[in-house]
Amino acid sequence: MKKICIVASKYYEDIINMLVSGVNDVLNNHKKKIKTKIIYVPGVFEIPYAISKNLKKYDAFIALGCVIKGETPHFDFISKSSIDAIIKLSIESKKPIGNGILTCLNKNQAIERADKSNKNKGKEAANAAIELLINDN
């Protein structure tokens, strides 16, 4: 049985709950049995650390978070450094990491991208991780 760890930021809890729900829909409806665990971290910046710490325990990961642009460059630093770290972890560990981290200009954009009746990026991240894991691409 394959094991997938969902690592989700607690920041913007309403958005994260929508993303987690989308991931759960995909995982619960998948043909093959997949064991899952969810780990919550304070923010997007902590997601790579949690993945790194758990690399040996899981076959794949799904990263969920939300960064909304404010008035300072904080958005740019957090978004880029977190995504770069996740990509590096995936390449070096040769383990799939579905990216469900939203980087939005405002909360309405985040809601739109997390809405299950719309584009839910959590679903997309779960599908990507599963496809790479199951097909061993």
Ranges and model annotations:
Residues 10-11, 66-67, 102-106:
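Short, ordered loop/turn segments at secondary-structure junctions
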